[in-house]
A protein has these predicted regions:
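TRAFAC-class small GTPase G-domain
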Residues: 1-134, 144
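Fe(II)/2-oxoglutarate
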Residues: 139-142
């Protein structure tokens, strides 16, 4: 379990599963999707194929989980702006079309630009959804 402070300052515990696109996990992904409380999905802004693969994952999520599951899309490697293959507006429009939040990050730039923010936002969305559905219970939530 990982403790994350939401964007509103609440501290909650989350189970985070990082598949990093590993093919080894393919047989288990549908089961994880069914029990997940939210998704933080990354693609590389300098790799259009990773953006297209992300779209396939979203279809799989929508098929195996509720339509209103919190999703945060993340365009990673924003330090490689000169090599960008996925237009920021295209990513923003896609995120909006599926009801997701969108951020761009870089794990290499000073202070890991927006890395903490994406986890906080995902946590906030999950906690908000959980609180609206189940009053008075703590959130044993999972992010995949």
């Amino acid at each position: 379990m990982t403790q994350i402070k939401t964007s509103t300052g609440e501290e909650r515990h989350f189970k985070i599963l990082d598949t990093a696109g590993e093919d080894d996990y393919q047989t288990m992904i549908d089961e994880w999707i069914k029990v997940a409380d939210g998704f933080l999905l990354l693609f590389a802004i300098n790799d259009k194929e990773s953006f297209e693969a992300l779209k396939a994952k979203i279809i799989r999520i929508k098929k195996n989980n509720k339509d209103k599951i919190p999703i945060v899309l993340v365009g990673n490697k924003c330090d490689l702006e000169s090599k960008r293959e996925v237009d920021k507006q295209v990513a923003l429009d896609y995120a909006k079309s599926i009801g997701a939040k969108y951020y761009e990050t870089s794990a290499l730039t000073d202070e890991n630009k927006n890395c903490k923010v994406v986890f906080q936002q995902c946590a906030h969305l999950i906690v908000s959804k959980f609180n609206s559905e189940v009053k008075g219970k703590s959130c044993p939530c999972s992010i995949y």
